[in-house]
């Protein structure tokens, strides 16, 4: 620690210089303030003063005005007081210096040299000011008369004596207090502290990890691009609330950008753009690179399914004059969150004649919405005694559809019959058609900006369509990369990546085999040299539930895309656990292209856990690491992300596709 000694007469401006030290991050030690504090806390010192200067201590407290009148009128008396106080003050100064972790400190003392404190200092400076200025300051600051102010000044060292003792002098002749404050800061930076501080800061930056909020790092150009990107993303997430809709949306956008469907037997060359549609439930896109696929590909793999309420095969029924849909929830949800939430119905119905009908109700401004009812608080005594998991059961997640019975009908279930007639009139459906339907209930309404500053986005299905869009979007404008760029948008991740459209299916192998054959490469060699970013969301640190996370190892809002070495639970179970070299590669390319990123894990050890598609890609001998957007309220009907993190995830995916 470098220590600066500050001295000067009363009213010279020493305190201003000391405050400037503190504003630059240093420790300021005001010996006058320390002395006054000791007069209140050091009984031995007070007793010694009372014995040496009778009449100056009353009821155990020093009468400071009386003591000042005595000592400033007689230099010998002042020297006697200094002899009593210097040792106590010096002892307290040493204690505070020893406890401090500041990079530098300053000791402000009129008797800097007499007390021996100057011996602790690397540099010394005297602060000087015109006598008349000092008098005015003392009158204004201490409320004393002009005569007493002058007597105090005359009892102290002359300017010449101070200059002779100190290595530096600072003349406090600035026209305003603000100007003198700037003068003090310039003095400290330019003459004493700056070189040492710069060296210290460089060492800290080189040795310590000091994550910064992304808004303190992002460029103006990226800020503008972020707003544009997020506006487009909000349109996508509002339009695509189930995997079929995301597949249709991305294929249409890709075809406009020159993509065509990959067929067996096709011959491809660098720059060609192809896709594979897997039963309208998952999709893969690729841009062929200049390098052989035997040298590997760069893959971004995300999923486009989200937790929801799926209709049961026989969903429609009536009870107590109201019609309902029975549901079976899909993925991990907190069931109580879905009550009273406005819901829309999305999906398709495959009719007996082979036609497929698309159904969407609840999204347009004039549409009705649907909901799961909840129990009124007045009758909730039993319910409230249950756990959150038990308070609302999965079987009771039933969708209220209507209550108006069919007029002039005397049969049973008149409300149910009326609902079926409406569905038949609009879609040509019968009750039996529900047996071959994929209909799901999702939160109604578009994505919305959150907060007065509009810095956040609330929407259904950020997990994982926020990463799916970030993985897909760069391909639309991608030229011919060195490594072939592949984007996988998979289904069924929320229930284990199983089934024909999940990441564990053979469809990915089939597509990659066709892609390799079309370019004369080996799929096995291709996988061996490929690299995959498993693009999935992470849990953003929420201070309201801080006890579930290790803050030093948890992603945060506005700190960029999150990179995860591993996920899983109970000892990393179900994780691919990326190698150090894999993490190092991602660090390197993100740093090279100014991608703001962070790292973390899913909560405290044994708090819970979760998985991604990373392990299924790694099982194919593809180097894989998780990367994605931090999310608040994950798996809730409305999830929240910041604007900065999705944009940085997009930027990271983009440079990953472009990187060799």
Give residue ranges: language-model regions.
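Hydrophobic anchor at the beta1->P-loop junction of P-loop NTPases
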Residues: 6
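P-loop (Walker A) phosphate-binding loop of NTP-binding proteins
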Residues: 9
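ATP-binding Walker
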Residues: 12
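Walker A/P-loop
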Residues: 15
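ATP-dependent small-molecule kinase phosphotransfer cores
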Residues: 33-104
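Small-molecule kinase domains that catalyze NTP-dependent phosphoryl transfer to phosphate-bearing small molecules
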Residues: 92-93, 119-120, 140, 144-190
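ATP-dependent NMP and nucleoside kinases share a basic, alpha-helical "lid"
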Residues: 94-99, 104-141
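N-terminal hydrophobic/helix-forming segments and targeting peptides
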Residues: 194-660
């Amino acid at each position: 620690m470098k220590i600066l000694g500050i001295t000067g007469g009363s009213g010279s401006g020493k305190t201003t210089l000391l405050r400037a030290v503190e504003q630059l991050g240093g420790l300021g030690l005001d010996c006058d303030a320390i002395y006054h504090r000791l007069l209140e806390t050091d009984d031995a010192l007070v007793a010694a003063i009372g014995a040496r200067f009778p009449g100056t201590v009353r009821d155990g407290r020093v009468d400071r005005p009386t003591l000042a009148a005595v000592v400033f009128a007689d230099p010998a008396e002042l020297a006697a007081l200094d002899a009593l106080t210097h040792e106590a003050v010096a002892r307290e100064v040493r204690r505070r210096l020893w406890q401090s972790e500041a990079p530098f400190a300053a000791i402000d003392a009129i008797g800097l040299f007499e007390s021996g404190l100057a011996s602790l200092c690397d540099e010394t400076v005297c602060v000087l000011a015109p006598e008349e200025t000092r008098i005015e300051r003392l009158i204004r600051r201490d409320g004393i008369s002009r005569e007493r102010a002058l007597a105090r000044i005359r009892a102290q060292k002359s300017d010449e004596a101070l200059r002779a003792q100190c290595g530096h002098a600072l003349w406090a002749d600035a026209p305003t207090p603000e100007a003198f404050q700037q003068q003090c800061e310039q003095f400290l930076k330019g003459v004493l502290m700056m070189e040492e501080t710069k060296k210290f800061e460089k060492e800290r930056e080189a040795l310590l990890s000091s994550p910064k909020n992304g808004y303190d790092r992002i460029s103006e150009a990226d800020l503008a691009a972020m707003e544009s990107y997020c506006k487009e993303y909000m349109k996508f997430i509002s339009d695509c609330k189930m995997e079929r809709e995301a597949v249709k949306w991305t294929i249409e956008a890709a075809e406009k950008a020159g993509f065509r469907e990959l067929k067996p037997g096709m011959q491809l060359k660098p720059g060609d753009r192809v896709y594979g549609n897997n039963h309208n439930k998952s999709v893969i896109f690729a841009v062929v690179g200049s390098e052989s696929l035997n040298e590997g590909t760069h893959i971004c793999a995300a999923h486009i399914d989200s937790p929801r309420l799926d209709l049961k095969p026989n969903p429609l029924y009536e009870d107590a004059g109201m019609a309902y849909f029975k549901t079976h929830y899909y993925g991990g949800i907190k069931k109580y969150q879905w009550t009273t939430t406005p819901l829309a119905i999305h999906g398709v119905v495959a009719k007996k004649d082979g036609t497929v009908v698309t159904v969407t109700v609840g999204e347009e401004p004039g549409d009705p919405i649907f909901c799961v009812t909840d129990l009124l608080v007045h009758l909730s005594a039993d319910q409230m005694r249950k756990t959150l998991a038990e308070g609302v059961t999965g079987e009771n997640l039933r969708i209220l559809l209507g209550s108006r019975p069919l007029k002039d009908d005397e049969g049973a279930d008149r409300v149910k019959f009326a609902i079926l007639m409406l569905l038949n009139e609009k879609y040509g459906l019968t009750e039996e058609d529900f047996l071959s339907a994929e209909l799901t209930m999702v939160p109604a309404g578009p994505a919305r900006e959150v907060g007065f500053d509009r810095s956040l986005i609330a929407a259904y299905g950020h997990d994982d369509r926020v990463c799916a869009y970030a993985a897909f979007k760069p391909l639309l404008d991608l030229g011919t990369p060195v490594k072939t760029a592949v984007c996988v948008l998979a289904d069924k991740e929320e229930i284990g990546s199983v089934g024909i459209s999940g990441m564990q299916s053979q469809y990915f192998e089939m597509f990659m085999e066709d892609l390799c054959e079309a370019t004369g490469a080996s799929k096995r060699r291709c996988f061996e040299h490929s690299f995959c970013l498993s693009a999935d969301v992470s849990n953003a640190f929420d201070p309201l539930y801080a006890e579930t996370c290790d803050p030093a190892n948890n992603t945060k809002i506005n700190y960029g895309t999150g990179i995860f070495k591993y996920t899983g639970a109970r000892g990393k179970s179900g994780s691919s656990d990326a190698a150090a070299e894999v993490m190092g590669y991602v660090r390197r390319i993100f740093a090279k292209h100014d991608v703001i990123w962070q790292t973390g894990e899913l909560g405290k050890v044994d708090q819970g856990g979760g998985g991604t598609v990373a392990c299924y890609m790694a099982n194919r001998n593809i180097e894989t690491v998780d990367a994605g957007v931090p999310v608040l309220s994950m798996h809730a009907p409305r999830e929240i992300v910041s604007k900065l993190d999705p944009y940085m995830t997009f930027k990271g995916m983009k440079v990953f596709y472009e990187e060799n």
